[in-house]
Regions:
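Divalent metal-coordination and catalytic microenvironments
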Residues: 22, 43, 66, 115, ...
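Divalent-metal coordination cores built from histidine and acidic residues
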Residues: 33-142, 425-429
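Short acidic, glycine/serine/threonine-rich loops at helix termini
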Residues: 58-62, 88-94, 126-130, 156-160, ...
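Active-site beta-loop-alpha junctions enriched in small/polar residues
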Residues: 24-30, 52-54, 82-87, 118-122, ...
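Active-site microenvironment of metallo-dependent hydrolases
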Residues: 7-8, 40-42, 226-242, 246-488
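Active-site mouth loops of central-metabolism enzymes
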Residues: 19-32, 86-100, 163-166, 170
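Histidine/acidic residue-rich metal-binding segments in metalloenzymes
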Residues: 96-116, 123-188, 195-215, 226-240, ...
Length: 488
């Protein structure tokens, strides 16, 4: 392979522009245009985006918004067509996409680059007609199929990959990553906000298999992007952990481009100060210095998506013991994986109430359960970002504060907030589908940081409370989660 890193006349280092192999723009709470401006300034000029967050809320209207708004991004945002809308049968989403919809959209929108991550692993393995139909539609359109198989091992993994699924970003260990490579998959090494797996997986990359690895951020906040960067941070970390810079750059450039059949243009490149800190000196797109300016997005088409039932404090209570024990979601800070704990009813010292309220106006479902290890002792946190159905999710100690938080988010059209003693002490409005803000990254970050500080007043000890909270309703990642239909 030709060398990817060269010296510039002014003594710096020139690298190909970076590619994020898998990201959900909505997790940044930024619109595609604003997200693209931010990552482009950090050298990422291409990102493979799976919009299954907004499509689970708004369906095809949400997809259309993302594609249109992305046209104002200086980065090339390529969108996959979500495969799991809804993500599972165990939740209420705002929309659904059928096999016929999938085939029609691939035909109508040739710019769609892949079938988004196939989270319905049981459906693949059992030969579910809907799942296999979507895979067949992607194959007929000549599109790669992105995967999602946490803790994938053995014969189930081999069968999952053999169905035509060519990538996975859910590996937690080097051994898991190696098994996925052996099954024929490309492994995307994830370093995001809620899930940070790069250090654990990097030892799997060898002289014989490095072409089968890429970097991705998956779900990353605007504040993390501003603080340390996205893909440039992956390169920086990999080199600090001992990877050769040339190889680290390959995982961020030519490898994801090859996987998705994208060109690597000599006219798109990044100049960095050195091969340690990878400080960005300049970014060049189409042979010209990057222009990251642009108009503010129009978000009216995807506003007003929070439709809650009438609520009282009495709606928020957890079920009692079953067979003498409480079922409890054991939260692990910095991980998307939870534990299924069985607690004695007298052992409630560290428990907090988790509640999900259906917010799409479909059925008004409300479900609650106990969580452990969050540290929360008073007040409530609430969010309309709850993967992947994005119903309203609240964590609290006081049902009255939970009700206040839910009502406040409904008044904002979605977002995140902290309530203490009946008062909203911090919020982040997300009026675009209850997921995104029309504001610039710096404004979103300031609000998000204020939320984190406010969350500390509840006793919450999680490093990124709202990022962790948003995954407590995602049943496709084990072991115990809560949706509007109950514990899964």
């Amino acid at each position: 392979m030709a060398k990817l890193i060269s010296r510039t006349e002014d003594g710096f280092y020139r690298l190909p522009a970076f590619v994020d192999a898998h990201v959900h723009v909505e997790s940044s709470h930024l619109t595609p245009a604003r997200f693209g401006r931010l990552i482009a300034a950090q050298g990422t000029l291409t990102a493979i985006c799976d919009p299954h967050e907004i499509v689970n809320v708004m369906g095809e209207a949400g997809l259309a918004f993302m594609l249109e708004d992305a046209k104002r991004s200086p980065a090339d945002l390529r969108f996959a067509l979500p495969s799991c809308v809804p993500a599972t049968p165990f939740e209420t989403s705002g929309a659904s996409l059928s096999v016929a919809d999938t085939a029609r959209l691939f035909a109508a929108r040739p710019e769609l680059i892949a079938l988004g991550e196939m989270m319905n692993v049981p459906g693949v393995l059992s030969g579910d007609a809907e799942v296999l139909g979507k895979i067949a539609a992607a194959k007929a359109a000549g599109k790669p199929i992105d995967g999602h198989f946490p803790a994938g091992h053995g014969d189930p993994l081999v069968r999952y990959a053999a169905a035509g699924i060519s990538s996975d970003h859910e590996s937690l260990t080097a051994d898991e990553a190696l098994e996925k490579v052996a099954a024929g998959m490309t492994v995307f090494i994830r370093e995001g906000s809620a899930a940070k797996n790069l250090a654990a997986i990097l030892p799997a990359v060898t002289d014989g298999n490095w072409e089968r690895f890429c970097f991705c951020t998956d779900d990353i906040s605007a504040e993390d992007l501003l603080a340390s960067g996205g893909i440039v941070n992956c390169i920086r970390m990999a080199v600090a952990l001992g990877m050769d810079p040339e190889r680290a750059v390959a995982l961020a450039t030519v490898n994801p481009a090859r996987h998705y059949g994208l060109p690597v243009s000599d006219l798109d490149f990044v100049v960095v100060r050195d091969l340690v800190g990878f400080e960005i000196i300049r970014v060049v797109k189409d042979g010209r210095p990057l222009d990251a300016s642009g108009p503010s997005p129009d978000s009216a088409a995807v506003a007003n998506t929070v439709r809650l039932p009438d609520l009282s404090r009495h709606d928020f209570r957890a079920p009692g013991p079953k067979d003498g024990k409480l079922d409890v979601i054991g939260v692990t800070d910095g991980s998307l994986v939870t534990d299924h704990l069985r607690r004695d009813p007298s052992d409630t010292g560290d428990l907090a109430l988790l509640s999900v309220v259906e917010r799409h106006g479909k059925n008004g479902n409300i479900a609650s359960a106990w969580t452990a290890r969050t540290g929360l002792r008073r007040g409530a946190l609430a969010t309309t970002v709850a993967h992947d159905h994005h119903n309203l999710l609240a964590l609290g100690n006081d049902p009255g504060d939970i009700r206040t938080a839910a009502a406040h988010l409904a008044s904002l059209g979605g977002g995140q907030c902290v309530v203490l003693n009946g008062e909203v002490i911090a919020d982040l409005p997300l009026p675009i589908a209850g997921l995104m803000s029309p504001c610039p990254a710096a404004d979103v970050t300031a609000k998000a940081n204020a939320l984190k500080s406010a969350a500390r007043q509840t006793g919450c000890s999680l490093a990124d409370p709202f990022a962790t909270l948003s995954f407590l309703a995602l049943p496709v990642i084990p072991a115990l989660k809560l949706t509007d239909r109950g514990l899964v």
